[in-house]
């Protein structure tokens, strides 16, 4: 009889823990949903706290266009090839004037308008930290195109992330960007498993490198980082579309925020099909990050 009572007590304790946790997450969800009210956009959110194990998701069934957020999984696929010995950080790649496509975001093109030779490490740095489109396509060519990235994701059981087109293809046709999509929780899972290095996804050198260049991201200062204290550590990757007929297909930021108490917030925010201004789209993301920061810091 005592054993039965103990089992019942354990089950009751577990039940109330789950109810309490869900109630807490629901409270955060309500705060975020207040930000989303009356916004003329489809907004997807996934948040996971490393200590609390709370999971929050909003509009998770929608396929959000990633734009340059895709450079994070592309970089992981390249690093995987480096770890296998098929490529190396020091390997030099010639970039010709023909590679420097017009009308695309590229610090490489700005710095080396006549072409140059860079190491794979340097190209990865440009591609992730500075979101270089030309660097992205060069890396894709090195590993065999988008199919290789998809195979990497599938082999490591990352579902609900699709990468079918490179930057050049996306720039030629507005609708092509929708072939590169993710759900918020799928992107968050990629962040979490990479950060935890689940199943030794990367070697130590590659692991340290990807998080270094994610922390050094120069784009999107008004998004996840926008309203956080100045010295907050945020390792993140942004994604931004153009505007067509008054609609911005994608204003995104995904990453890992480190709280002063050491807790980690894994967060993915996608703002799609927005008729709002670029400033409002970015503020949606920074508002969500700030609310989440305050919520977990003051629990």
Curated annotation (Swiss-Prot):
Active site per UniProt: 68, 167
* Top-level taxon: Bacteria
Supply the induction statement.
Answer: Expression up-regulated from an upstream promoter, Pout, associated with the IS1999 insertion element.
The protein's matches in InterPro entries, at most eight in alphabetical order, are given as:
Beta-lactam/transpept-like, Beta-lactam_cat, Beta-lactam_class-A, Beta-lactam_class-A_AS
Disulfide linkage: none
The EC designation for this entry is 3.5.2.6
Keyword Hydrolase on entry: yes
Q: Which residues bind a beta-lactam?
A: 71, 131, 167
State whether keyword Kinase applies.
Answer: no
Describe activation and inhibition of this protein: Inhibited by the beta-lactamase-blocking agent clavulanic acid.
User: Where would one find the signal peptide in this protein?
Assistant: 1-23
Q: Name one GO biological process term.
A: response to antibiotic
What top-tier enzyme class does this entry carry? hydrolase
Instruction: Provide the alphabetized UniProt keywords.
Output: Antibiotic resistance, Hydrolase, Signal
Pfam short name (any one): Beta-lactamase2
The coiled-coil segments of this chain are none
Q: Name one GO molecular function term.
A: beta-lactamase activity
Catalytic reaction(s) noted? a beta-lactam + H2O = a substituted beta-amino acid
The Swiss-Prot or TrEMBL record describes its family as follows: Belongs to the class-A beta-lactamase family.
Its biological purpose is as follows: Class A beta-lactamase which confers resistance to the beta-lactam antibiotics, including penicillins and cephalosporins, in E.coli strain JM109. Acts via hydrolysis of the beta-lactam ring. Has penicillin-, and cephalosporin-hydrolyzing activities.
List other remarks: The class A beta-lactamase family has a specific amino-acid numbering system, sometimes called Ambler or ABL numbering and often misspelt as Amber. A multiple sequence alignment was used to derive a consensus sequence and then the consensus was numbered taking into account insertions and deletions. This allows use of identical numbers, e.g. for active site residues, despite differences in protein length. UniProt always uses natural numbering of residues, hence there appear to be differences in numbering between this entry and some papers.
The identity of this protein, by name, is: Beta-lactamase VEB-1
From which organism does this entry originate? Pseudomonas aeruginosa
Point out the gene that encodes the protein. blaVEB-1
